[in-house]
């Protein structure tokens, strides 16, 4: 998958879509046997621990920490050596239409707002590649379209190679890349 490209993986439940993502991200359960290589920027990342792979993940649920503010959630994901974190957070929130949400409790966010914060958290962690696991499936049709457009636009603009797992043909069509089906 090239920079800014989105590969879509579709298939019925139990076909191995989520297992594929777990393998790439480095958290496949030891009960599973796997082999092969995963190249990111020309480097095989399979021997690296999950936290060293620099893979960004976006799931069905935003998975925001309830005990941290919106800014705290974003700061948590940023590399330790990142400079000007507060400014990056403020600029990022402004960029996704959530200016001034820094101190908000994540529990007070709507589904769309929480999805936007989860996307920004992913981008601020400075990944080398991104995995999307049904990230729009819990949103209503209109909100799903809006968030899908935002996510795909931001990932393309960031030139991040992305793999999307979905059951939704609208997701695959809007991703605009190659579609692979697992059986």
Regions found by a protein language model. Name each.
Residues 130-134:
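Catalytic Walker B motif of ABC-type/P-loop ATPase nucleotide-binding domains
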Residues 43-59, 80:
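ABC ATPase NBD coupling module
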Residues 159-165:
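Conserved H-loop
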Residues 84-102, 150-153:
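Conserved ABC ATPase "signature" region
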Residues 105-109, 113:
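Conserved ABC ATPase signature
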Residues 29, 48-49, 68-87, 95:
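ABC-type ATPase nucleotide-binding domains, specifically the catalytic core motifs of the NBD
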Residues 119:
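Hydrophobic anchor residue at the start of the ABC signature
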Residues 124-128:
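A short, proline-enriched helix->beta-strand linker immediately N-terminal to the Walker B motif
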